[in-house]
Design a protein with these regions (language model features):
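Solvent-exposed, extramembrane regions of membrane proteins
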Residues: 1-13, 17, 78, 82, ...
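Membrane-proximal N-terminal segments immediately preceding the first transmembrane helix
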Residues: 2-24, 312-323
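Beta-strand elements of modular eukaryotic interaction domains
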Residues: 12, 242-245, 306-307
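Alpha-helical transmembrane segments
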Residues: 16-59, 325-359
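Beta-strand-rich binding-surface signature
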Residues: 21, 32, 252, 269, ...
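Eukaryotic intrinsically disordered and solvent-exposed regulatory patches
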Residues: 31, 239-241, 301-304
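Long, solvent-exposed, non-transmembrane segments immediately flanking or lying between transmembrane helices
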Residues: 38, 42-273
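Membrane-proximal extracellular juxtamembrane segment immediately upstream
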Residues: 267-383
């Protein structure tokens, strides 16, 4: 028993096993083998290394976005002239990555709390029995008092009076001048894995350049100042259409960087996408077209609280940062090479199947490839 254990350990540590190889001179099998190996080699070089960059590690960025609108708008509604600046038409005003630029509005001035009739169509009535006191209607403006107003044939409500009438949207939009507003975007990204920080104000963009440039896909692709009309156009929308009822546009800042080269070549690319807003062009959600919201400015007059209500139609802009940085790394490189070497074994498996099961001389090849032993014969010899 001791000698058997010793022999087993000796065989394990001091012997090397290698598979038996048979050289088959067959043109068909040889061509199939080389074609498969060539295909695997093309896959490793073309797909894994060139297209998928299998020799590099990757990282996504931590980013921040700051935005600033500039421009002045002018309206003249029923003889009332007004100038609109940034504080009036941008919501919210903090310079976030998502904001709304007002392009059209419906204004209801001098509202105060009281009893007044609903709009026709909101809750029609023929008698007080049709107006249940203390109840609400989802599309109404307030709480019903239980009275039917004979002059309008609608229920009386406790609400901010006079109630808003938003059935007629101004056309053309009141703030068509918004087409000339400009948007300044400041974006900073950091790739933690590679300890690289970049800004869209890349080399060559200084105060003098910013004061004169305007983004153009061909002539000034790195300028961080955009004309609102150009943004709408590049997103595939018509400005007058989207300005009337509002809509949404996505500005994508794409940081795709190969850090094997100098970091100064890591620069942003801007893409513009129309999300919704033009019913005749892209928007399929016909039940709720455009983008709008309401806000009120409250004030006191003769010790009575009043408000001016604005239904705002605007262009919502969402600035989205997408990023991917790559850099050479020995670990994924060795992993990709090892996987490729393993895939080469497919050629051997396929060729063995052809040799052993498809060719006319398959029995001959089986005898050459496999060595058969007879256990009973070995037992007799040992005895």
């Amino acid at each position: 028993m001791k000698s058997q254990i010793t022999n087993a350990l000796s065989d394990f540590f001091f012997e090397y096993e290698t598979p038996r190889q048979v050289l088959v001179r067959n043109r068909r099998v040889g061509v199939v083998c080389r074609l498969i190996q060539l295909g695997v080699l093309a896959y490793i070089i073309g797909w894994v290394f060139i297209y998928e960059k299998g020799y590099q590690s990757s990282d996504t960025a931590v980013s921040s976005v700051f935005s600033k609108m500039k421009g002045v708008g002018y309206t003249n509604v029923t003889g009332t002239e007004r100038i609109w600046d940034v504080a009036d038409y941008v919501f919210p005003p903090q310079g976030d990555s998502s904001f709304v630029v007002m392009t059209n509005y419906i204004i209801t001035e001098g509202q105060k709390m009281g009893n007044c009739p609903e709009l026709p169509g909101k809750h029609n009535c023929s008698s007080d029995a049709d107006c249940e006191g203390g109840s609400f209607k989802r599309t109404g403006h307030g709480q019903m008092t239980g009275k039917c107003v004979n002059t309008t044939k609608t229920c009386e409500v406790l609400a901010w009076c006079p109630v808003e009438d938003d059935n007629n949207i101004p056309d053309p939009p009141l703030l068509m001048s918004a087409e000339n507003y400009t948007l300044f975007i400041k974006n900073s990204v950091t790739f933690p894995l590679f300890e690289v920080t970049r800004s869209n104000l890349v080399e060559g963009i200084d105060n003098n350049y910013i004061s004169k440039c305007l983004y153009d896909q061909e002539d000034s692709p790195l300028c961080p100042i955009f004309k609102l009309g150009d943004i709408v156009k590049m997103s595939g929308f018509n400005f007058e259409t989207i300005a009337k009822v509002g809509g949404a546009i996505g500005i994508v800042i794409d940081w795709t960087c190969n850090l094997d080269f100098n970091v100064k070549h890591c620069k942003p690319m801007y893409n513009f996408h129309g999300l919704y807003g033009n019913p005749d062009e892209k928007d399929k959600a016909r039940a709720s077209v455009g983008y709008n919201f309401r806000f009120a400015k409250h004030y006191m007059e003769d010790k009575v609280q009043q408000r001016t209500l604005l239904k705002v139609f605007g262009i919502r802009i969402d600035i989205i940062v997408q990023s991917l940085a790559r850099k050479f790394d020995i670990i994924p490189t060795l992993t990709a090479i090892g996987s490729g070497v393993g895939i080469f074994g497919v050629a051997t498996v396929v060729c063995d199947l052809v040799l052993l099961y498809l060719l006319p001389k398959r029995e001959f090849y089986k005898n050459m490839k496999f060595k058969y032993t007879d256990t009973q014969t070995q037992v007799k010899h040992s005895l």
